[in-house]
UniProtKB/Swiss-Prot annotation:
Residues 7-129 form the Arf-GAP domain. Gene3D superfamilies: Arf GTPase activating protein, DNA helicase RuvA subunit, C-terminal domain. This is UBA domain-containing protein 3. SMART domains: ArfGap, UBA. CDD domains: ArfGap. GO terms for cellular component: actin cortical patch; cell cortex of cell tip; cell division site; cell periphery; cell tip; cytoplasm; cytosol.
Length: 601
């Protein structure tokens, strides 16, 4: 009920007292907040800024949401906006509100801080006696006559202020009362007095001793973490003298940090110090022997070479590759022979080559999958013999491969290309530059070009269908590449003889006019050939009966038996009727085609 009554009293102060209905800082209407220690009414925006100042400067409460005590109501009655502004800013013309304060939040905050926190607007000649009469000043005579009574009276007078100071953390009532008496109840100035009094007051010895012991304990804990402090007290003692911890203590303690263990092993020659206890770190489960050499890695695999491999072996590479090195340095006493490296070859199927090579190869342990080849019962040294053709029978190997034996490298010699034989056919033209491939091209008689003789250039007496087109066998030789030994005189016989059954086209243009109708417009006159006279063409045959086709100088089989000829097989180019050796009767076409396919006349 009292809270409700106090809320009504606060609202009456806002409505009845002039100036309280406006904000004390920005003069905005609609106040809903108040700073009860300053005795002013505020708007929402200015109340937010007052909260930023802290409770030691301004204590903000809501008019309707918070509860008000009687002392706080009396405080608001004594001050109000007009009286408070006269005290905090006695010269408003000298310190007016900035014009952009309503729009700029930072400008408004600076103005409020200068007014209440920094107190820049206070008049120097303004004294505390100009306070409202509701706060009577303390008289000197009364305070000197009865100090105990004045103290009790002051506590009763400043009960609200003392409770405020208690809320702010100032628990010494005597100091608080004395500060309030000096400032006539002004909490803000009393706080300043209390702060000044507390800073000038010397610290008690008991507090210093407890602080010193606390510092020693903290320093000892820090030194356990290997952090040295350089703090000295006035008596000359160092912090942590009672808690001296050496570095050996840290070393003797077990550690789980793999990097610290690595540093310890490095400093002690790759050996674990006796002080370090057994650790559960997975990085240091296996003991490390001092001065242990690093194991070599296996090629194309991860991890060291198995320790069972002891003796050394060498792999002799051919000198052609330019490699003469020991690739593997460890092997078992019982060596396993590898297959010797075979040179790459190109061309047809491989032929036995006769050369002798000695590879001294010692394979690593059979546990390595890359070197587990063959049986282990063979000897370490193998004289591999592969049949090369002997030098007496093959010109390619006159400078044959020499067996090197147990030397570090093999001497591969390329064949002497100058001794290369050229297979020249009697009819083929000779080419001195043909060293790599000798191919006999088909030869034609120079006196009988196009299969015709000089005496009979158009093959009047010789049948065209009986002409033979023959070619000499083609010889192709393969050339070796790389370091592979050249092949012996391998030749591929390619028979190319065949019977030509096609019609040999004449060398002239056969544009012929048949029955007054040209094949391609105005036909061209033949120069020397006369098919109707010399070749036995029948010009009375129609142009569209199947014998003659437009655009071709050739003839075809008749589509039907409309044209009847002699029916006898005669010389192909000398028939009175029927075209180009074709029988006039279609019943004999099958035998005629078979004869043509067999190359017979």
């Amino acid at each position: 009920m009292s809270g409700r009554r106090n809320e009504t009293a606060i609202r009456e102060l806002v409505q009845s007292v002039s100036g309280n209905n406006l904000c004390a800082d920005c003069s905005t209407r609609g106040v809903q907040w108040a700073s009860w220690n300053l005795g002013i009414f505020l708007c929402l925006r200015c109340a937010t800024i007052h909260r930023k100042l802290g409770t030691h400067v301004s204590k903000v409460k809501s008019i309707s949401l918070d509860e008000w005590s009687n002392d706080q109501i009396e405080k608001m009655k004594h001050w109000g906006n007009i009286n408070a502004n006269r005290y905090w800013n006695p010269n408003p013309l000298s310190h007016p509100l900035p014009t952009n304060a309503l729009s700029d939040e930072h400008v408004m905050e600076k103005y409020i801080r200068d007014k209440y926190e920094r107190k820049l607007f206070l008049d120097e000649n303004h004294s505390t006696n100009s306070k409202p009469p509701s706060l009577p000043p303390r008289t000197k005579s009364s305070s000197q006559s009865s100090p105990m009574a004045s103290t009790s009276t002051s506590k009763s007078r400043y009960a609200d202020s003392l409770s405020t100071l208690h809320d702010m953390g100032f628990s010494d009532d005597s100091v608080n009362t004395h500060a309030l008496e000096e400032t006539n109840g002004d909490v803000t100035r009393a706080i300043e007095k209390i702060v000044q009094h507390g800073s000038s007051k010397p610290q008690k010895p008991s507090t210093l001793t407890s602080t010193k012991s606390t510092i020693k304990l903290v320093s000892a804990r820090l030194k356990k973490r290997n952090k040295n402090l350089s703090v000295h007290f006035e008596d000359g003692t160092k912090p942590g003298d009672a808690y001296e911890v050496t570095g050996d203590t840290r070393a003797a303690s077990p550690t789980l940090n793999p990097f610290e263990q690595m540093m310890a092993m490095t400093n002690q020659g790759m050996s674990v110090s006796p002080g370090v206890e057994t650790t559960s770190s997975p990085f240091f489960t296996a003991p490390v022997e001092p001065n242990q050499p690093l194991q070599p890695l296996r090629p194309s695999m991860t991890g060291p070479v198995p320790s069972s491999m002891g003796s050394e072996a060498t792999l002799n590479m051919p000198s052609t590759y330019g490699i003469d090195s020991n690739l593997y340095t460890n092997s078992n006493s019982s060596s396993i022979v590898q297959n010797p490296l075979q040179p790459a070859r190109t061309g047809p199927a491989a032929i036995n080559y006769n050369y002798t090579t000695n590879y001294s190869v010692s394979s690593p342990s059979v546990t390595n999958p890359f070197f587990d080849v063959g049986s282990s019962t063979q000897n370490a040294s193998l004289m591999g013999s592969t049949g090369y053709p002997s030098s007496a029978n093959n010109v390619y190997y006159e400078n044959s491969y020499q067996g090197v034996g147990t030397s570090m490298s093999d001497n591969y010699q390329l064949p002497d290309m100058s001794k290369l034989s050229l297979n020249e056919q009697p009819a083929a033209p000779s080419n001195s530059n043909s060293q790599y491939m000798n191919t006999s091209m088909p030869t034609l008689d120079s006196t009988n070009m196009y299969g015709q003789s000089n005496q009979d250039p158009y093959s009047m007496s010789n049948g065209v269908y009986g002409s033979n087109y023959s070619a000499q066998p083609s010889t192709m030789q393969m050339q070796a590449t790389g370091i592979a030994p050249p092949q012996p005189n391998m030749s591929m016989q390619m028979p190319m003889s065949m019977q030509s059954t096609g019609y040999q086209m004449p060398m002239e243009n056969t544009w012929v006019d048949y029955n007054g109708m040209s094949q391609q417009g105005n036909g061209m006159q033949p120069a020397t050939m006369n098919y109707s006279n010399s070749m036995g063409y029948d010009t009375n045959v129609p142009a569209d009966n199947g014998y003659y086709q437009q655009g071709y100088g050739n003839v075809m089989m008749p589509p039907d038996a409309s044209y009847t000829g002699t029916g006898s097989y005669v010389q192909p180019m000398n028939q009175p009727s029927g075209g180009m050796g074709a029988p006039a009767d279609s019943s004999k076409a099958d035998s005629y085609i078979q004869r043509i396919m067999q190359g017979k006349q």
